[in-house]
Amino acid sequence: EEFIAPPLDPYKEALEGINELQRQQQKLDPKPFVFKLSEILRIYVQNRFNMPAMELTGEEFIIESVSNPFFQNYEDLLREFVDRGDRVKYSKETADTNETNLLLDSALHFVKDSHSRITDQESTDSQNQKTHSE
């Protein structure tokens, strides 16, 4: 009898990933840190919004996200996250902890905020369905 773990909630998975990364922040170089953070954010978007986020370039990721009305509030945040992240990942300069903290905060804010908006939306939807069915 093989035990198959239920798929993790994308939100919990993202939060756990970010918390885990926060714990390793001192040990990791900025580049691998940002690669991992970016991956967590994209996996969250991919699983939560059925968007092939892992296969997209930074620019495609922005265009794709922003085409979804839900993401329009986050355009600046995501664009900045991708731009800063790419600078850390691909430039020769070494990012300082300030920079990685900013990226971490942005990712965390995006995950928490989008999650609470979805949850609000879902509870509004289910209340609307109740009202209609009576």
Segment roles from a protein language model:
Residues 1-29, 117-134:
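Hydrophobic, helix-length membrane anchors
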Residues 71-134:
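Cytosol-/stroma-facing membrane-proximal "stalk/adaptor" domains immediately downstream
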Residues 10, 17, 40, 81-84, ...:
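Amphipathic, well-ordered alpha-helical segments in soluble domains
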Residues 22-25, 66, 89:
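A structural signal for long alpha-helical coiled-coils and helix-turn connectors
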Residues 32-84:
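Short, charged amphipathic alpha-helical segments flanked by flexible coils
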Residues 4, 8, 27-35, 51-55, ...:
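Conserved phosphate/pyrophosphate-binding and hydrolysis machinery centered on Walker-type P-loop NTPases
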